[in-house]
């Protein structure tokens, strides 16, 4: 007679009408509780009509919430159709939905997702609202266009180097006013270095004589052809970027349509120079009307970076209850791994989050400024190294951004000197406390002349 194994108490069910979807490129597998349908696992093709039929079936059997993995971009149409049908949709991080090793199939994955979601063991990944998602899509596409344009800048520079035209040595940027005038003249057929040097802009630091010497080249038809096509492709992508700027401006106008005018006028800009690859409209004013706070007053955050931050996070940061949760989502906080009471590792997690990369770049920039954040970066860089200092400074900038967006905090830089003074006072206070613990009293040394 075989032994009857005792039943193990299962986890409590929190979402009784939950479904799980295993997303694929050709078809999607949907699993629902067996109490809702005689066929709890069904497969639907990836066509729009089939996805709509999936939504109708889920609505018919009374499913209230659905979970799916963020598999590539295949989940996006499913998410949008189900959301428009009035079903709560959750996108889970694949790192948190790993199944035990063994038999793996699409059906098992869908049932595993449904079980985890029913027991409330999954967390929803952040996804902004429809209007913010549109703004984010435009900005990400714009960055991709700029990457394509940058590749053709390299092609132009390589073609110039083949012809021994040392333009990049006499101008700071070959896509500047002087550089583009000279390149367009070469493409148009001009070969006289004296005539080309006359295109020098008055703001160019190199003299006409130096530019003349750099433009004596060895012209070859194949390299001129490459230069011509690279210039045409660069102009093409720049035109697409301008079209993208129009869409971004319209998306911001939709977001600010129902926003009242700020009570206080916008603060004076810290920098008046236009940044490279900046958008072709007043981003700072539009963002100030949208959120009521001038993010550019935070050192390290310029108008375009502020726009990127808002596009990636949205305007409502209450989804992160504290600044610690926000920095953890950005993977800028320590990732402690503890076993047996011992800290095995405290390295921050690796992430492909775009915001994290932008904030790290901002931290490197602010480290060269005479500000409190710059002094903080330099103090840490000398003690623990530049890599960790970049992460810590990026986290500080992220906390300032969170407080400005969540609580309307207006940032005012105390300056590097005040920061160093407060740091000195804090260290002295710690020394006095440590000395008192050992029964000593610290006294300030008198200056001996």
Residue spans for each PLM region:
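A detector of single, family-specific signature residues
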Residues: 1-449
